[in-house]
């Protein structure tokens, strides 16, 4: 009996030590202010971006030296989002590696709140306040204990982690330099007050990428409203290229159901990969443009860089703090590198056609000094005589300075007796093109005085006008 009693006492002491320690350090040794911190702070290394091999423990000063924290460099704090598996997702080491490649001497800390993030979504959403408090306590401790400047701190939060980052920023003794929200979660936060979610007040500068806002407000995976100083909506912020239903069916057919969860979060997670792209391809940042609506952007009406109307996506963003949040838009490719080249095209259709034709399909081909991009499809909602139409197109390659273009009006997909009897057509004298990335405006003229574009017929060629006054650079 005595041996059993001793065993029970020993087990009790062992269990008590487990509940009072974290990272191998007794809670009492950490100080009373830090006992309630459940989140873990792993300083990952360039050599091992996938494992949490060394933890910075609030209240334990030697842990900072043991992990070789660099006090003279930037610090990135990465905060993950909700998880089904209770494990880190594959993007975490990719982001860590990209941060170290861009800033080799920096500190990249990964916040582990997996046990709280694995609960039912509403429960995990509620835990973001506690996680934010944990992160704020850690940052305040680093600032007070080691005089580490918060100007060197950049928080990066994905999904629920974006709101945890915002709450952390609101609770630090001084503002951190920057918070990047990577598609902040929508449910439970779309209508939340600023103190409970990411907001512009949470850091000196807050930039946000919105990549999966499809659905009604409050039900979309990503938050729809702007919550930063600069809010960027790639491809309108709804679905991302390569993440559509057709792609899902193809992947399921090829690989089975194992990758379904990846497809569901494809657009949501694209925010992370866009930011990674900005770290790895610093020479060619993607450019976004301020616009009142995505509909106006699709018409090509917003490709201006005057008065901070355009900005870089991702790490090299210009830290413009407007009085109110600015919504910015851009197109991207379906895979890295994501950068594309935007063009506004304006065409005036002249003629005697009395009918208005709807949903008309066209193709345009651009030819430049470096490359060419042919048969770019676009659709005009309506086409009428003696009206000017503006629309947006983009190329996946840099074609250089524009020299020539071709325009084709495609036949309807259905048979039309009127088109068979007499193809409708318009006279076009000039086509105006503005390049978003270079801000150059070019006017293209018909080789003859006027070109006649007919539905279902051959392409019409336009060349750069000779009058130099017509071709200029505009802000």
From Swiss-Prot:
Residues 417-421 are annotated as: Important for interaction with lipoprotein particles. GO terms for cellular component: chylomicron; extracellular space; plasma membrane; very-low-density lipoprotein particle. Residues 341-464 form the PLAT domain. It is found in: Cell membrane; Secreted; Secreted, Extracellular space, Extracellular matrix. Glycans are attached at residues 70, 386. Disulfide bonds join 54-67, 243-266, 291-310, 302-305, 445-465. Residues 430-434 are annotated as: Important for heparin binding. GO terms for molecular function: apolipoprotein binding; heparan sulfate proteoglycan binding; heparin binding; lipoprotein lipase activity; lipoprotein particle binding; metal ion binding. Key enzyme in triglyceride metabolism. Catalyzes the hydrolysis of triglycerides from circulating chylomicrons and very low density lipoproteins (VLDL), and thereby plays an important role in lipid clearance from the blood stream, lipid utilization and storage. Mediates margination of triglyceride-rich lipoprotein particles in capillaries. Recruited to its site of action on the luminal surface of vascular endothelium by binding to GPIHBP1 and cell surface heparan sulfate proteoglycans. Homodimer. Interacts with GPIHBP1 with 1:1 stoichiometry. Interacts with APOC2; the interaction activates LPL activity in the presence of lipids. Interaction with heparan sulfate proteoglycans is required to protect LPL against loss of activity. Associates with lipoprotein particles in blood plasma. Interacts with LMF1 and SEL1L; interaction with SEL1L is required to prevent aggregation of newly synthesized LPL in the endoplasmic reticulum (ER), and for normal export of LPL from the ER to the extracellular space. This is Lipoprotein lipase. The gene is LPL.
